[in-house]
From Swiss-Prot:
InterPro entries: GH4_Enzyme_sf, GlycHydrolase_4_CS, Glyco_hydro_4, Glyco_hydro_4_C, Lactate_DH/Glyco_Ohase_4_C, NAD(P)-bd_dom_sf. One of its GO terms (cellular component) is cytosol. It comes from Escherichia coli (strain K12). This is Alpha-galactosidase. Binds 1 NAD(+) per subunit. Its EC number is 3.2.1.22. NAD(+) binds at residues 5-71. Homodimer.
Length: 451
């Protein structure tokens, strides 16, 4: 290793995300002199990120260098860490297409980035480019560690380790640590007092144990307190981001039924199951406060907010931000210095969870040190949680097989097995929907889908 790492960002035009990750990086002593290589295909967005990153670096007293690239392989050369954060096809046209075509066929969605027709199409658009990153890494930085933040996380991660098993990679999300903080806030307790053990699949992991530290140093189960707060109307608290559309009722109701709390948000979870979004059942939407079309609304708001923020950053002499809850800088620091840390990552199920399929993508606690990312064994999940996860893994299995073998039929089979889609549409209607999505996305999808 050199004295300072090289950190390459693929999709550096995702300026808000880059800002959060590098804000953390620049405050770690071992990473302050890192070479930051920013790469994006959009020169304007790339330059915007460059402005923000330079001010972040200077404000934090970091002294590394920044290079900007529109060519991926050039940016990756000799990298130690590769952070991937992009959206193939963007909000427009592709996300809009996913929502509008599905709606024409009678299928409502909330986020559409993980499962269902929206998640399936996003995977088909995204995986070929992730594979190209793996190809380039194999050639110019074979020992680098990839930190992948791109959804649909499980399918993307699975497709990469299936085709490029030699690439060191982990899929990262902030739902485990983020929800833990959220639950602490709901109960008015310090998040630092929490202790938990969590496992499952991306966006559907559960806190198998959730405890808080008491005054005498012992730990007590937090679940009875959490349930009592919900039933008394004291939890959940209003959305911390001020988003009144997202009220977090779905997860608390699932907690009442299952006995365990899930990591991903209510707006996500509502579309991973067959129970909350049904034609003609406005009563369910109202009762559970399901925010239909949430992701497109969020995209419009974020774009507007970003333009405002960017103007402020351009005028500011310095940029100081609070530490984020993202794992990226923790992982880099642990690998670079050997100082051990524990994170939650999405990895191949090599005997980690006994009652989920071997080889599927699971989210578990991982030890990180100079040896890299080392997933920890969970054992057997409660059977009802594993059964629920399996309904989502079915879709992931078939879609991953579809793209690995270029089997168009498996794309339809994946959509057929989606719990929400199957609860709303008949078989022929599902096939017609997939036909229309493939046609509408055109060249954003791999050529074999159009043969």
């Amino acid at each position: 290793m050199m004295s300072a790492p090289k950190i390459t960002f693929i999709g550096a035009g995702s300026t808000i995300f880059v800002k959060n990750i590098l804000g953390d990086v620049f405050h770690r002593e071992a990473l302050k002199t890192a070479h930051i290589a920013l790469m994006d295909i959009d020169p304007t967005r790339l330059e915007e990120s460059h402005i923000v990153v330079r001010k972040l670096m200077d404000s934090a007293g970091a002294s590394g260098k920044i290079t900007c690239h529109t060519q991926q392989k050039e940016a990756l050369e000799d990298a130690d860490f590769v952070v991937v954060a992009f959206q193939i096809g963007g909000y427009e046209p592709c996300t809009v297409t996913d929502f509008e075509v599905c709606k024409r066929h009678g299928l409502e969605q909330t986020i559409a980035d993980t499962l269902g027709p929206g998640g399936i199409m996003r995977a088909l658009r995204t995986i070929p480019h992730l594979w190209q990153i793996c190809e380039d890494m194999t050639e110019v930085c074979p020992d680098a560690t990839m930190l992948n933040y791109v959804n649909p996380m499980a399918m993307n991660t699975w497709a990469m380790y299936a085709r490029y098993p030699h690439i060191k990679q982990v899929g990262l999300c902030h739902s485990v640590q983020g929800t833990a903080e959220e639950l602490a806030r709901d109960l008015n307790i310090d998040p630092a007092t929490l202790r938990y053990r969590c496992a499952g699949i991306n966006h559907m992991a559960f806190y198998l144990e959730l405890e808080r530290k008491t005054a005498d140093g012992s730990y007590v189960n937090l679940y009875p307190e959490l349930l009592a707060a919900y039933e008394a109307g004291q939890a959940p608290k209003p959305n911390i981001h001020g988003n009144t559309r997202c009220q977090n009722i779905v997860r608390y109701e699932m907690f009442k039924k299952l006995g365990y709390f899930v990591t991903e948000s209510s707006e996500h979870f509502a579309e991973y199951t067959p129970w909350f979004i049904k034609p003609g059942r406005e009563d369910l939407i109202e009762r559970y406060k399901v925010p239909l079309d949430e992701y497109p609304k969020r995209c419009v708001e974020q774009l507007a907010n970003w333009h405002k923020e960017l103007e402020e950053y351009k005028k500011a002499s310095r940029i100081d931000i609070k530490p984020s809850r993202e794992y990226a800088s923790t992982i880099m620091n642990a690998i670079w210095t050997g100082e051990p840390s524990v994170i939650y990552g999405n990895v191949r199920n090599d005997g980690l969870i006994d009652n989920l399929p071997q080889g599927c993508c699971v989210e578990v606690a991982c030890l990180v040190d100079a040896n890299g990312i080392q997933p920890t064994k969970v054992g057997t999940l409660p059977s009802h949680l594993a059964a629920l996860m399996q309904t989502n893994i079915n879709v992931q299995t078939l879609l991953t097989e579809a793209i690995l073998t270029e089997n168009r039929d498996r794309v339809y089979h994946a959509a057929m097995m989606d719990p929400h889609t199957a609860a709303v549409l008949g078989i022929d209607e599902i096939y017609a929907l997939v036909d229309d999505l493939i046609a509408a996305h055109g060249d954003w999808l791999p050529g074999w889908l159009h043969r």
